Amino acid sequence: MAKLTLKAARVNVGLDQKTAAKELKISNKTLGNWENGVSAPKPEKIDLICNLYKVNYDDLIFLVANPL
């Protein structure tokens, strides 16, 4: 499987941002920040994301907005 961004993984399972955020018990803004690389999810949320989006951790790419 090709690597997926968080947004691509979400879209692949047919979820909009509002629904995914609700399922993950986070705000739409937080999910948007994760998808845009502004911030990153904590490890316990990554497990929830993988389950909700039906992907393995190794299949995901986490964007970084301001790389060093």
Task: List each model region and its residues.
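A short, Lys/Arg-rich alpha-helix, primarily the initiator
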Residues: M1-N12
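Helix-turn-helix DNA-binding elements, focusing on the entry/boundary residues of the two helices
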Residues: L6, Q17, N28, P43-I46
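Residues in the recognition helix of alpha-helical DNA-binding motifs
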Residues: A9, E23, W34, L63
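The alpha-helix within a helix-turn-helix
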Residues: R10, A21, C50
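Short alpha-helical DNA-recognition segment
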Residues: G14-N33
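DNA major-groove recognition helix of helix-turn-helix/homeodomain DNA-binding modules
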Residues: K25, E44-D59
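Short, charged recognition helix plus adjacent turn
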Residues: N33, A40, N51, I61-L68
